[in-house]
């Protein structure tokens, strides 16, 4: 904190008012200072009850060119106390400023107009007699309108919106200073003690005796409290001084308290004697301390040797108005820091306000006390009427009449390059970027690409822009479920029915996979989809509209990070051998929980790519045609070191990727995924079956060509995928001659145009698996120049062949010209004695030893615009399932004709990853977990349900509120389990704010599981007893703990500092996954949100959600657990922070109550009673 300097001194008081009292002629002193948190104002209160405000004026340079000063202009001045009592404190509010004196509180707006004046006569309660001898005020915890006032008699509270009622807390008063943390009130007592008071429970929580005498100042920042004060000076002879006043001395220490640990931490020494203390608002570890003599110190509470010392000049710059002031030593009071931390101010005994700022670079001084200050309201400027008569004739210019005052540019001041068009008009289409690149070759004419731009010189049917915009508006997004339900309840006329049929036809355009050649447009089914959010959240989005598989296959949501991997995951999911390998691994248990894994390897989830892929596949199986979120997989993938090293993490939905970069990214992920699954299988289960499934074997031979070169080497290797290569032009031309002998090479040059009908994938495969090149020999080059022959050949193809088509844009243009480049199947002739593998499109009677490969599907890149544009490309996948082809575009899933799958003539369609599999493994049945047989699966490890598995060290002091299950209580089909989950917010929501102030949710906040509780639900002695109460470890940054909803405090999830026994996320998830597959029935309140946050797909017949049971569709309002417990169970829950065990138990009781009223036929009457009570209570539990 080096570089602070004084920039201004302000005479903040004026001459005192005249009065009969003899002491009224004493000069006014400054008794209160406050920086405004909304506007650039400093508030100042004096000893005669006046409040003044100042605002920064223009900068000015001093005598030293490196020293600058800031002038201040007076803004307002008004009386804000009764009977000339001093202003003790100011408290700023969004609507004005509150001024406190010993017997009243005034609330004025920032212009000085009175909004409210409160004294003991203002209240109608019996507590009004306590409204005197006031000392301090603050806002209540996490509120702006509840004002808490401390006095010598009690602790009081009133509401600015209802100022006629005064409430008294259960406190005996004797308060000097009041402040607040997020949960408690901090009370500085007159005897030097510090007290923490809970306004919710109306009780004192903790008390500290920090100073034996008086308390002079107190400040709060986060979970830290700083105090300074006085101690009683010990006397040597006190036998005659029993009735005399005590002597006090300034404490040379500043006490620091941590409310998280509820104890004092190391104090800060300050030998000069601390009179004021303030935390820096932007650097919470920095404390500013001042003494009466003007000494200032910036101290780091974590490193108290890091001190910056300053001395304030308290001597007046001019002669004091009263001679008596010369005989007194100047002293310093009222230290305050601005909200942005760039300024601090204090006053002295000469009624002067000093302003300091941080300016260590000589730059221009900022004038802002807050980061984004609101403009100060200025008085209206009255323009005097013109006295001269202005004639209107040809000699008088029109500019003689002045323009009115305006802030915005006039319409006549538009830019010269700005063109205005008619309504609904649009700018011309941009020139294709590919044409601009080719124009640099200085070729006069280019051949017209009919496949890219459609037929040339064709007349189009006229369609107005309004009609086109109407069609596009119906294609984009279907209605929200709530809007659609509202529309169905209305009576429609014949006209509206016809309009609905028209809209339905337009809505079906999203599933259009082929467009007429006359329209240069990519079909709507390939468009980039975006999830829309209404006021009811993502639950209101109609995912089922985009799924046309008749309840068979699900889509993946694309609002999570790294959602570009969705098409590849959907492709591999439908390969039975790969799918079964991933899912079978889940029967084994792999739950690392050591600090090496969690902290060093940065794997706080304690999971792996293999496990998360298996969980994801199982959830996709259970979801049927419901959408699935892959955020759990994304979190583990994002923390993977190899993925970070290979730059495979994408957090902006590909906004900065062009066509080639997106293809490189998905191909890189394909290689990473297969390699990581192979590594995880070896580490977790010593299973190498993925190697026999996907390994491509090759041999590389190096031979010298010289007569005496001895170099010869032969090496064997393997890889898990194969990169496809484009044959060079001479190879393609040679193959064209062999396949088409009628070509006359002497008269016609072989070009890609002449080879388009001759080549397909097999040509590329044969070139890829047999590579030959020559390189200079470096070892014997000095004897005679010769070369080395390097030959590599594929010797064995796996049953599951993954081909990476990593070609350039120019090479893809060549593929677009081949009519049948992509083949549905081919045959690989098995080699003998390391002979090269041969490929054939069909099998003859002479080819017996061969393997038939079928196309499972492929990932395809869709270029919505030019290949070089950023963020306009997306990935889809085609998958063949049970003889039918399906298109997967994130959560859009639809059947598509086979001819469209193999049609690669579109320039915007580029195959990126092809997956072929051996026909012998294509018919393997999928392993699906069935709840009836799950418990008897061979090798199933379900021990995690019956034991603890804490991450890192075990905190013995942590109290267990649960009792583990025993094997005798093993869950089975139909077992009732009551659960409740609490979450923390890792990322805030993204909002789009329109010009009219309307806010649209772009991406919701990202919640992560923080605590899970599960209770026994079946009737018996242990009904309602918890058997799971797990806190989930988090090592990353947490944006918001949501303490008032989750009950999670800062530090509770930290594996190092937490006092709770933590578990990894996979440990909690595996417990729920096992319970789900064992067939238990989950009871809870709002389980949709819980399961969505956990990423668990639970069938509806295993859910008992009390939020749905006690829901009346006519009201369109779901009731809270707290309100239902109050009305039905006559109990008050969630009185403090939420407790997930309490919430789960309450949901269980509500479910039992639902069974009871349903059996007695009282369900409808009870539901009507609940909503009737809710309307009277406004659906809130009375305090």
Curated annotation (Swiss-Prot):
Positions of region (Linker): 369-520
GO biological process, any: nuclear-transcribed mRNA poly(A) tail shortening
Regulation: Positively regulated by the regulatory subunit PAN3.
Cofactor note: Binds 2 metal cations per subunit in the catalytic exonuclease domain.
Enzyme class: hydrolase
Region of interest: Disordered: 1-24
Ranges of residues in domain USP: 521-919
Swiss-Prot/TrEMBL keywords: Cytoplasm, Exonuclease, Hydrolase, Metal-binding, mRNA processing, Nuclease, Repeat, WD repeat
Binding-site residues for a divalent metal cation, renumbered to this chain: 980, 982, 1090, 1143
Protein name, as recorded: PAN2-PAN3 deadenylation complex catalytic subunit PAN2
The organism of origin for this protein: Scheffersomyces stipitis (strain ATCC 58785 / CBS 6054 / NBRC 10063 / NRRL Y-11545) (Yeast)
Organism phylogeny: Eukaryota, Fungi, Dikarya, Ascomycota, Saccharomycotina
Gene: PAN2
């Amino acid at each position: 904190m080096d570089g602070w300097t004084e920039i201004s001194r302000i005479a903040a008081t004026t001459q005192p008012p005249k009065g009969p009292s003899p002491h009224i002629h004493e000069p006014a002193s400054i008794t209160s200072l406050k920086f405004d948190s909304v506007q650039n104002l400093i508030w100042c209160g004096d000893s005669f009850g006046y409040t003044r405000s100042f605002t920064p004026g223009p900068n000015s340079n001093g005598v030293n060119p490196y020293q600058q000063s800031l002038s201040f202009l007076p803004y307002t001045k008004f009386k804000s106390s009764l009977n000339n009592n001093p202003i003790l404190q100011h408290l700023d509010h969004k609507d004005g400023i509150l001024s406190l004196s010993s017997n009243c509180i005034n609330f004025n707006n920032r212009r000085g107009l009175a909004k409210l004046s409160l004294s003991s006569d203002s209240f109608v309660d019996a507590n009004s007699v306590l409204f005197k001898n006031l000392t301090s005020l603050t806002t209540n915890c996490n509120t702006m309108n509840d004002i808490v006032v401390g006095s010598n008699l009690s602790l009081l509270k009133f509401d600015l919106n209802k100022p006629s009622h005064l409430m008294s807390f259960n406190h005996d008063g004797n308060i000097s200073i009041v402040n607040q943390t997020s949960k408690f009130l901090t009370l500085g007592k007159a005897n030097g003690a510090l007290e923490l008071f809970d306004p919710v429970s109306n009780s004192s929580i903790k008390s500290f005796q920090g100073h034996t005498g008086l308390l002079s100042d107190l400040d709060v920042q986060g979970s830290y409290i700083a105090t300074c004060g006085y101690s009683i000076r010990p006397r040597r002879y006190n036998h005659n001084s029993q009735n005399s006043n005590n002597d006090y001395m300034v404490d040379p220490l500043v006490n620091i308290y941590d409310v998280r640990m509820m104890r004092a931490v190391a104090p800060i020494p300050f030998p000069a004697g601390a009179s004021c203390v303030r935390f820096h608002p932007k650097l919470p570890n920095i404390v500013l301390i001042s003494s009466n003599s003007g000494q200032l110190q910036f101290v780091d509470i974590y490193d108290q040797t890091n001190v910056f010392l300053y001395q304030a000049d308290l001597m007046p710059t001019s002669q004091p108005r009263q001679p008596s002031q010369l005989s007194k030593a100047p002293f310093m009071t009222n230290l305050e820091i601005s909200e942005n931390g760039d300024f601090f101010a204090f006053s002295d005994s000469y009624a002067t306000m000093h302003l300091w700022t941080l300016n260590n670079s000589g730059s221009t001084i900022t004038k802002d006390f807050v980061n984004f200050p609101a403009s100060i309201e200025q008085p209206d400027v009255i323009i005097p009427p013109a006295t001269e008569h202005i004639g209107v004739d040809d000699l008088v210019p029109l500019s003689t009449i002045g323009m009115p005052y305006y802030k915005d540019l006039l319409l006549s001041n538009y830019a010269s390059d700005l063109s205005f068009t008619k309504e609904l008009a649009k700018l011309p289409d941009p020139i294709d970027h590919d044409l601009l690149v080719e124009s640099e070759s200085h070729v006069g004419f280019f051949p017209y690409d009919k496949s890219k731009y459609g037929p040339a010189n064709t007349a189009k049917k006229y369609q107005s822009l309004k009609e086109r915009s109407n069609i596009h508006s119906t294609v984009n997004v279907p209605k929200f479920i709530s809007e659609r339900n509202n529309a169905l309840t209305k009576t429609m006329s014949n006209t509206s029915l016809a309009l609905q049929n028209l809209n339905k036809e337009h809505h079906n355009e999203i599933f259009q996979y082929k467009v007429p050649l006359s329209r240069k447009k990519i079909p709507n089914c390939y468009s980039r989809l975006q999830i829309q959010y209404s006021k009811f959240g993502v639950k209101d989005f109609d995912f089922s509209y985009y799924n046309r598989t008749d309840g068979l296959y699900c889509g993946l949501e694309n609002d999570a990070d790294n959602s570009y991997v969705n098409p590849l995951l959907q492709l591999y999911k439908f390969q039975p051998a790969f799918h079964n390998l991933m899912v079978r691994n889940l029967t084994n248990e792999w739950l690392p929980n050591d600090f090496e894994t969690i902290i060093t390897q940065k794997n706080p989830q304690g999971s792996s790519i293999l496990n998360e892929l298996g969980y994801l596949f199982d959830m996709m199986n259970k979801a049927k045609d419901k959408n699935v979120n892959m955020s759990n997989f994304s979190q583990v993938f994002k923390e993977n070191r190899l993925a970070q090293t290979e730059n495979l993490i994408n957090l902006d939905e590909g906004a900065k990727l062009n066509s080639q970069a997106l293809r490189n990214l998905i191909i890189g992920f394909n290689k990473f995924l297969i390699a990581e699954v192979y590594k995880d299988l070896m580490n977790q289960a010593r299973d190498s079956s993925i190697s026999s499934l996907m390994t491509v074997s090759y041999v590389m031979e190096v031979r010298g060509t010289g007569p005496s070169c001895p170099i010869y080497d032969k090496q064997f290797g393997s890889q898990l995928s194969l990169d496809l290569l484009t044959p060079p032009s001479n190879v393609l031309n040679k193959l064209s001659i062999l396949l088409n002998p009628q070509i006359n090479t002497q008269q016609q040059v072989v070009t890609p145009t002449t080879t388009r009908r001759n080549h397909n994938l097999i040509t590329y495969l044969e070139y890829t698996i047999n590579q030959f090149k020559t390189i200079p020999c470096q070892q014997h080059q000095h004897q005679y120049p010769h070369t080395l022959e390097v030959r590599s050949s594929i010797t064995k193809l796996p049953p599951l062949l993954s081909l990476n088509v990593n070609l350039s844009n120019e090479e893809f243009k060549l593929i677009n010209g081949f009519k049948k480049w992509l083949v549905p199947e081919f045959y690989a002739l098995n080699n003998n004695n390391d002979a090269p593998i041969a490929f054939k499109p069909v099998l003859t009677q002479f080819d017996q030893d061969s393997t038939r490969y079928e196309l499972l599907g492929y990932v395809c890149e869709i270029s919505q615009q030019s290949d070089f544009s950023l963020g306009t490309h997306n990935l889809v996948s085609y998958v063949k399932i049970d003889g039918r082809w399906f298109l997967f575009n994130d959560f859009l899933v639809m059947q598509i004709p086979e001819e469209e799958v193999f049609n690669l003539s579109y320039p915007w369609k580029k195959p990126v990853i092809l997956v072929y599999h051996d026909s012998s493994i294509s018919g393997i049945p999928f392993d699906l977990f069935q709840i009836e047989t799950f418990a008897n699966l061979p090798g199933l490890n379900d021990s995690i349900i019956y034991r603890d598995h804490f991450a890192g060290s075990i905190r013995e002091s942590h109290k267990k509120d649960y009792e583990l299950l025993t094997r005798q209580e093993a869950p089975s089909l139909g077992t009732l389990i009551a659960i409740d989950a609490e979450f923390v917010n890792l990322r805030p929501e993204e909002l789009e704010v329109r010009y009219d102030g309307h806010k649209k949710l772009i991406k919701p906040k990202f919640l992560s599981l923080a605590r899970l509780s599960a209770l026994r639900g079946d009737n018996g002695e242990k009904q309602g007893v918890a058997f799971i109460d797990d806190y989930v470890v988090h090592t990353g940054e947490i944006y918001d703990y949501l303490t008032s909803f989750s009950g999670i405090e800062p530090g509770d999830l930290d594996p190092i500092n937490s006092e709770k026994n933590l578990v990894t996320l996979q440990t909690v998830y595996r417990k729920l996954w096992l319970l789900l597959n064992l067939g238990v029935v989950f009871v809870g309140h709002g389980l949709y949100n819980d399961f969505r946050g956990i990423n668990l797909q639970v069938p509806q017949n295993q859910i008992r959600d009390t939020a749905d049971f006690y829901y009346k569709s006519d009201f369109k309002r779901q009731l809270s657990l707290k309100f239902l417990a109050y009305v039905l169970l006559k109990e008050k829950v969630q009185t403090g922070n939420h407790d997930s065990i309490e919430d789960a138990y309450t949901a269980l009781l509500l479910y039992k109550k639902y069974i009871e009223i349903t059996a007695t036929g009282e369900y409808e009457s009870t539901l009507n009673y609940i909503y009737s009570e809710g309307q009277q209570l406004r659906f809130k539990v009375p305090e």
